[in-house]
Amino acid sequence: MRSDSIDGAEPLYGAYPGGRRLSPMDRYMLDFQRAYPTRPVSVSGYLLRMSGSPDLDEVRAAVLDRVRAFPVLTERLVTRRGRAPRWEADGEIDVTRHVREYPLPAGATEDDLRATAGRLSGMVMPLDRPAWEVGLLTSPDTGDVHVLFRSSHVWVDGLSQNRVLTFLFGDEAAAGATTGPAWMRTGKLTPGGLVSAARRQATTWAGPSGALAALTGPAADGHSMGWASIEVDRLRAVGQAYGASVNDVYLVGMGGALAAWSSPLDQLPVRTVLSVSARRPAERSILGNAFVATRVALPLELTSPGERFEQVCRQTAPYKGGSSASLSDRFWSDRVPSRFGRRTIGGGQELRKAAVNTTNLGPIPGPLAVAGAPVTAAMPVPPAREGRRQVVVTLGGLGRTATAGFTVPAPRAAELARLWLAEIEGLERAAGIVPAADQAAAALVADSASR
């Protein structure tokens, strides 16, 4: 029996001699991956643009230096007879398996770069070694080099992965600090809060999601990807104008973008799965999964910005500030019998439950550099999966720039990205906000093939 206390004073899991126990969500992810070995259980990856072109040997040497500095990067899944699986750091890696080159075709364009990133994001990450990879996407014609980082969701959640990226490419002193992910939950569990959480989850997950016409036609040949970038301060200014958070701005923008992108097929609300951090302060220095999922009905029909924000904020309010709502949700999530745990993972990926899947990781603090080459942009790559019909969106970025990455089972992801950015700009105008002209900060990576 676990020793987690009702007031949350003790961590639910931690680093122990002989290895780190899997959190319940880690185990659900593992069970899902084992049940469906050809379906990737991946965190949204990151495509890093750089000012410079380090070669494969240079990147491998730089990564090895960081692995020696941060042995947690050598954690691998170990299963021994009679014992539950654990993460154990063995102190070394085979760098040729973890840092690999993926040459782009001759004459490669941005479309080829996106296609390669999407293809790699749909590959299963092996669990017989540390569950991450640094891929160099090289262009023989231009000499350009991009890095695609991807990892298994069995090992980390999105916030933990931000920390892993800092271990590998961030300032070494900052990476070694034990501040951990920024979104900690300090609230206390109470009997009343647990009852409210049970009711909230039952209500939130009741009934199907509305459908979008763009997702119900014949399956597309692969997925398309798109990105939109904007200054974080602009998102904050919009949120302040409407009494909302950056996450609310993100979701309201998604609702408007989807309404312009595709018509609904029924009268049901179009819902998105939203991941919410449930990480305790005692877990700040530990990797692994510490989140819960809820559903949010997106405002596709309401025309007034105030009405749209009211609808979203009403649903996200329980999880804001020092609330213990996500910890209360996690209390119940952690108690799902293991034989049913993988169903909770698969259910959130079903179109009938949610047409959209959204995550907000926040920008990586930065600065980052790969073998001395400064990283100029970090673009989330939501994982593609054959047969998955949802729109998958991740808000991340680097430093003061937020970037939303879109993976869509249709050839129109870049259009959706443009529409999301246009929605944010429309919310600015409605609030009387005039942002400073900065084309670099408000750049949209366009998909020329979709024009």
What does each of the following model-derived ranges do?
Residues 30:
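Conserved donor-binding loop and adjoining core beta-sheet/short helix segment
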Residues 2-27, 36-389, 396, 400-401, ...:
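Soluble acyl-CoA-dependent acyltransferase catalytic core bearing the H(X)4D motif
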